Amino acid sequence: MNRFREDVEEYTRFAAKFDTPVRYELLHGNSHEAISRIAGFYRVARSFSRKFDEGIGLARYEPVLSAIWSYQPERSQDPIEAVLDLTRDLKRLYRKEVLSASSKFLWFAWGREIIIYDSQALASIQTRFPSLKPKNYYGYCSAWRTLFAEDMGEIESECLRQAACMERWFHERVFDWHLWRLGKRQSRASGNADSPLVIGKR
């Protein structure tokens, strides 16, 4: 049995239910509603105090949206630098460290190239890269890419077998889902279970 079978099945359903329609809404519909749904579903809303947007007369998450639109993929900015710059911008605006949230927000804005930072996935990656420290986004991305390259062919084969999406962004998110699932299993074994990758620990 292909070890990515469950991940492809589960992410296919999740992408259809949330990622794809919400990303479309962010880019082509009510962006405020979309960013609110992302923040709520991914449980990052608590990092963005209302006193820094509604409290100063702005719409909820308006500073987040303004910051996100400053980093567009067509500007050819390095995606890692874009995530780190957005993290700094949002920390300045909301007085919180929000690396995980920034990577998630920017993934929805770009839809590709952005590697989502998540602590459950980090736990999985650390089994191969034990010296990797939390919040080291450069190191996280480097390790993530190494592991993805090893498994990309198997993921593609399983997506083909299931007649799932064959685009690279989808394969990358299947791999994210796989890392989260392994990390969650490790957390449960240690008695420290947390939410899934889509709502992972910050």
Language-model regions, residue ranges each:
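An N-terminal alpha-helical hairpin/helix-loop-helix interaction module that forms a charged
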Residues: 1-95, 111-202
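Short hydrophobic alpha-helical segments that form membrane-spanning helices or hydrophobic packing faces
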Residues: 101-107
